[in-house]
C-alpha cells in the first residue's frame, strides 16, 4: 500500500494512534482466536448486576444502548495478537470511579458511576451554555456533549489497551498518548461526529480548574506528580489536533481565543506527525474488509440515537464462553472492578 493510499485509508477509518516507533507489525503474529470480547459472568452479557438502586437504571440504559457490543464492533477491524475483554460494572472508588484498562487481565471496565457523573456534567454544561452562549465558540446539543464525552473516554481507555496488546512503545506520558488516540480517532469519523467529539472534549476540559502551583509548607503541590496533564494542557492539546486536521472547521476556537495563535501555528505539523505514526505502526494491523463495515456506521445514531435501531453492523465474531478473554482470568470471568482515571 502506497503512502498516499495509506493516508486516504486513515481519513475514512478511526482506530488508534501510536507515538514513536514500534515493533514491526510483521514481527507480531495475530492469533485467529484473539479478539475483543465481552467478559461474561452468569450470563450477564458483560454487564455486571448491581443491587445499588442508584445504578440499576444506568445498567438498563447501557444495555439498551449496547455500549459494550458497539465498542467491540468498533474495534473489530484491529487484528489482535492477544484478546481484550470488555465489561461494565459498579466499580470500587465511590461516585467518581471512571473507566479504566487493567493490563493484568487485559480488560477495559466501564463504571456505572461514570455514566451518572457524565450525565450530571452534561446537565451543568447545557445550563452554562444556555446562560451565556456567546462564551462558547460552537453550539452543541445535549446528546453530542454526552456521548462525545463518553465515547472519548472509551477511546482513551481503548488506546491504553491497544498500546499494551500491540506492544507499542510510547515516548512521554502514556496518558497524553491515549488522549491523542481519542482525538485522532474521532477526527476520522463522520464530520458531525468529529465536530461533536472535539467540542465536547474542549468544553469539558475548559471547566476543569488547574491545580495550585504554589509551594505550601515547603512542599510542592503533588497534583503535578499525576500521570495526567492539567485540564488546560489537555484542552490545548486536543484543540491543536482538531485545528491541525481541519483548520476551516475548528478555526473559531483560535479566533475566540480558546487556542492561542502561537500554538495554532504549529498544529498542522503536530497533527501530521501523529498521522504518520499511525500509518507506520498501526495500519498493518487493520483488516480493511471489516474497516469498510465499521466506517459505514453513523456511530452516534446507531449507538445512542432515540429512534435508531442498533443493527447497523453485523459482526461475525461470536463472544466465547465466560472469561476466555484471557486464560488466567479469575473464576467466573469477574475481571477487575476497581477505580480508574481517564
Language-model features: locations:
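Bacterial N-terminal signal peptides
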Residues: 10-21
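Zn2+-dependent metallopeptidase catalytic core
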Residues: 57-82, 118
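Active-site recognition of the HExxH zinc-binding catalytic motif
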Residues: 110, 152-165, 179, 183
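Short pre-active-site segment immediately N-terminal to the catalytic Zn-binding motif
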Residues: 133-152, 166-170
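Pan-zinc metallopeptidase signature
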Residues: 219-342
